[in-house]
Every structure is written in C-alpha cells, then in structure tokens.
A protein has these predicted regions:
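Helix-loop "lid/cap" segments that line or gate small-molecule binding pockets
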Residues: 5-11, 31-49
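A short, structured active-site edge motif that brings together acidic residues
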Residues: 23-27, 52-56, 113-127
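Metal-dependent phosphoesterase signature
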Residues: 40-81
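Conserved phosphate-coupling serine/threonine residues in phosphotransfer and NTP-handling enzymes
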Residues: 97-99
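Acidic, Mg2+-coordinating phosphoryl-transfer loop and its flanking beta/alpha structural elements
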Residues: 146-186
Length: 189
C-alpha cells in the first residue's frame, strides 16, 4: 500500500509508477522524506531545486492518501500471538521503523498491542542510531537480540550492529528471499 501511495502522490505514468513502487519495496526502511527526494531526482529526473516546501507538501499528501488506503491493513498472520508470547517470556520488544510514530501507535492501538512494546524509535531517529541506543542503554548482548525486518536495508542494519536478522517475507520485491545468511519467515504461525 505504501508503494502505491508513493506512486499516487507523483501522478506518474504507468512505467514510472512501477519504478517508484519497486524502489519503495527494495528500500522499505528508508525515511519517507528521503524516498521522496530520491523519486524526484533519480526516477522523475526532476532537475530543479527540490525545496523543503515541495517535500513537505508531498509528505502531507502521502499522509492523507495512505490514511485512506490503509484502513483495511491486517496484521501478518500470528504476529499478535507471537508478540504476546515474547512479552510473557519477559522479552523486551522495541520497534525501530522509518514510519512516523503516530502511524505505528495507530496500529498498536488498533490491534491492542501497545502495552507489549517497551519503546518505539520512529522516523525521527536514524535506524542505526536507534539500534545502537537500544543495545547500549540496556546493556543487551548482541547475540541475544533478533531484528525482524522486511527489507535489504534492515538486513544491512543488522550486519552493522551484529544482531541476528529474521526476514519477514511479505514483500516479494525486497530481494531478501535470494539471500541465504539469515532466518526467513512468511508469517508467525
């Protein structure tokens, strides 16, 4: 839904829509603002200066369209039970996401999972900085942590902080299914 929303905010022709959607799917964990800048300059070849006002307009347009398009998003099968089991077993659950906190909180409340999450790190902090903060501030041993992600950039992040990675393969375009050095799942059942 997010990839389609990115394509929609640019009113791109079909060929460019596919490029925009593919870019989003491959770079899922990149910040929204950075995706918009990339789409303007690299996919649409926009040569003029892309100022903050234009970027903010696109971000706001994205928010409106995404809110409308995402009302029917469902959880990945079994993830709610999985989160509750982790919590019951005294595991600490953090969310590190390129999405804004209000979106994350919306889904946590919708599926009654807010109380199971210790802390959310959203688009306001770089994912690498967030992971370092989580590991350092809690004296976590890297080998006792696991990161669930759905993009190559999530996998790269885990390599940088030396944390195990589990690919959640809900996105066929992410190219994670071609990698061999980590756990892969399609759902949490």
């Amino acid at each position: 839904i997010k990839g389609i929303t990115f394509a929609d905010i640019f009113n791109a022709e079909q060929k460019l829509k596919k490029k925009i959607i593919n870019y989003h799917l491959i770079n899922g964990s990149q910040k929204r603002v950075d995706k918009i800048k990339y789409i303007f300059s690299k996919i649409l070849n926009y040569k003029s200066n892309i100022n903050e006002k234009i970027i903010n307009e696109k971000v706001n347009e994205f928010k409106k369209i995404y809110k409308k398009n995402s009302k029917d998003i469902n959880l990945i099968d079994g993830v709610d039970y999985f989160i509750k089991c982790l919590f019951k077993n005294k595991s600490k659950i953090y969310i590190v996401s390129a999405a804004p906190k209000y979106e994350i909180n919306y889904y946590l409340r919708k599926y009654r999972l807010s109380s199971f999450v210790k802390k959310i790190y959203d688009s306001k902090i770089d994912k690498l900085d967030a992971m370092k903060k989580i590991l350092t501030n809690n004296n976590f041993q890297n080998e006792k942590c696991i990161y669930f992600g759905d993009s190559i950039s999530d996998w790269d992040l885990c390599n940088k902080v030396k944390v195990d990675f589990c690919a959640v393969l809900t996105n066929k375009k992410s190219k994670l299914n071609k990698k061999k050095s980590f756990i892969k799942i399609y759902d949490f059942l």
